[in-house]
Amino acid sequence: MAKKLVAVVKLQLPAGKATPAPPVGPALGQYGINIMAFVKEYNEKSASQAGSIVPVEISIYSDRSFVARLLTPPAADLLRKAAGVQKGSSNPKRNPVGTITRAQLRQIAQQKLPDMNANDIEAAERIIAGTARSMGIKIVD
C-alpha cells in the first residue's frame, strides 16, 4: 500500500545553515517528523549554495517519513545579487536602485525555469523582468 501524504510544508532557509530552532522546529514538529534528520539532509543538499536563501518543499507522509525537495533561490534574491544591491527600492518607479543586463536576466531565467510556471525561456524572462521592475532594478541592453 502506498504511503498517504499528510502535508506539504514549504520553507525558505539559509543554505547549509538550517537549525532545529524556529521556523524549522515548530513547522515540522507538529507533524511528528525527526527534525534533526531533516536539518542534516537539508544542510548536506544545500551546502554548495552557501550564502543564499534556498526554498525547500517537504512532503510529509502518514508513517512520519518525509521527502525534501530543494527549489531554486527566490528571483528577488538572484536579482539583488546580480544588481549588487542590498534591497529593492521603496519607490521603484521614481528611484531605481540598480541595473542588470539582458544576459544576466536570461541567466537568472534559465536558473529559475524548472520551478517556474513558464513554458519557454522568453516567458520566464518576462516574469523575472517584472520582478526586477517591481524591485526598482532597470534592465539595460
Curated annotation (Swiss-Prot):
Protein's UniProt name: Large ribosomal subunit protein uL11
GN (gene name): rplK
Assembly notes: Part of the ribosomal stalk of the 50S ribosomal subunit. Interacts with L10 and the large rRNA to form the base of the stalk. L10 forms an elongated spine to which L12 dimers bind in a sequential fashion forming a multimeric L10(L12)X complex.
GO cellular component terms given for this protein: cytosolic large ribosomal subunit
SUPFAM superfamilies linked: Ribosomal L11/L12e N-terminal domain, Ribosomal protein L11, C-terminal domain
Example of a GO biological process term: translation
Family statement drawn from the similarity comment of this UniProt entry: Belongs to the universal ribosomal protein uL11 family.
Summary of the function given for this chain in its UniProt record: Forms part of the ribosomal stalk which helps the ribosome interact with GTP-bound translation factors.
One Pfam family of this chain: Ribosomal_L11
PROSITE patterns per record: RIBOSOMAL_L11
Record field: transmembrane: none
